[in-house]
A protein has these predicted regions:
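Conserved N-terminal diphosphate/IPP-binding helix and adjacent helical/loop segment
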Residues: 1-81, 87, 123-135, 144, ...
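Alpha-helix boundary/N-cap detector
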Residues: 2, 6-9, 13, 104, ...
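All-alpha helical catalytic cores of prenyl diphosphate-utilizing isoprenoid enzymes
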Residues: 19-32, 45-52, 107, 111-210, ...
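Short, charged, low-complexity loops and linkers
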Residues: 32-41, 65-67, 92-94, 146-152, ...
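A ubiquitous short alpha-helical element
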Residues: 39-45, 73, 97-102, 151-157, ...
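Short, surface-exposed loop/turn segments at secondary-structure junctions
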Residues: 68-71, 94-100, 179-182
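Acidic, Mg2+-coordinating active-site segments of isoprenoid diphosphate-utilizing enzymes
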Residues: 86-101, 105-112, 174-176, 190-250
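Primarily interfacial, aromatic-capped hydrophobic alpha-helices that serve as membrane anchors
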Residues: 118-136, 224-273
Length: 310
């Protein structure tokens, strides 16, 4: 896990700076903002971890020679990018408008990362063209997700739901005069984002199923069972496939193929590759834990039967 541990001190500084900035927001947005930031604070054990958002600039050190100050700024900007887009997601996923009070806060987050980028990239920099492209990619991906089976018909769109994360990788390459690497690094980042979404969707499938949100695991299961897109998938059906028929095994094999594709790009981003490997291992470990639990239950049932028969 060196992809994280090697950057703990830098991350502590970045999140401390983010706290300082948010503390300066007008009341009550300062308190609301600090509470929201704490939810995703990479320093806190109980927080929701979104490692790629704030670690990607540090992983870029594997192929760039940027000054630490520039890397820290890209990480800080991506923290605010993360917070801004998570609020967008909260609002879009909310049926009753319960997150609308976060809209003013989102605009302050937006102001912060835009201010950082303006410090780093002049108006004529190609960065701004990429910046706009990533917004367009995100907008299209989240708008059409419910009507399309991205995971099977346009898998790149799965990654594009997090396209603004790429501000960090593209920004780092432009600052280091390595624009020629943008296509291959973008492909590597997107491959990682796809597998990360697979892992998230395994964790969130019940909630997504209840809310009617698109979910890669459920979509994969639907295809595996040859169900039509309008067929109902019940929680019981998913549980049976996961815990009885080892569907997570098949899901894990897809993640393994993704890792092979990532390695095939032949980009020397060792930390991000190791991070991706940990994602794959998490899925495979989950599959093995299900099998072991089932085996223990079966043995327990036999022991119970024998004890009753003796």
């Amino acid at each position: 896990m060196n992809w994280f541990l090697a950057h703990e001190k830098d991350l502590a500084d970045v999140f401390a700076e983010a706290e300082r900035i948010v503390s300066g927001f007008p009341a009550p947005l300062d308190h609301i903002g600090l509470a929201y930031l704490a939810t995703f604070d990479g320093r806190k054990e109980e927080s929701t971890k979104n490692y790629i958002c704030y670690l990607l600039p540090y992983w870029m050190k594997d192929i760039t020679e940027l000054q630490p100050e520039s890397i820290n700024k890209l990480s800080l900007a991506n923290v605010f990018v993360m917070l801004y887009y998570f609020i967008q997601d909260d609002i879009m996923d909310s049926a009753k408008g319960e997150h609308k009070d976060k809209l003013p806060l989102a605009n302050l987050f937006h102001m912060q990362f835009l201010s950082t980028y303006r410090e780093m990239f002049p108006a004529g920099s190609p960065f701004w063209s990429y910046y706009e492209t990533y917004i367009m990619e995100w907008s299209e991906a989240v708008s059409n997700e419910q009507q399309s089976d991205y995971f099977h018909h346009d898998i790149g769109k799965v990654a594009k739901k997090a396209s603004p994360v790429k501000n960090a990788s593209t920004g780092a390459l432009l600052l280091s005069n390595q624009a020629h690497l943008i296509p291959v690094v973008t492909a590597a980042v997107e491959q990682t984002l796809i597998t990360l979404q697979m892992l998230d969707d395994w964790a969130d499938w019940e909630e997504d199923l209840e809310e009617g949100s698109y979910n890669c695991l459920v979509a994969s299961l639907r295809k595996h069972l040859q169900l039509s897109t309008d067929s109902t998938v019940s929680p019981e059906m998913v549980k049976q496939q996961l815990y009885v028929h080892d569907f997570l095994d098949l899901y894990g094999q897809i993640a393994i193929i993704h890792h092979e594709q990532l390695l095939g790009l032949q980009i020397s981003m060792t930390q991000m590759i190791n991070f991706h490997d940990s994602l794959v291992e998490n899925i495979l470990r989950g599959s093995n834990e299900i099998k072991n639990s089932r085996k223990m239950l079966a043995q327990g049932g036999l022991n119970y039967f024998l004890s009753k028969s003796s």
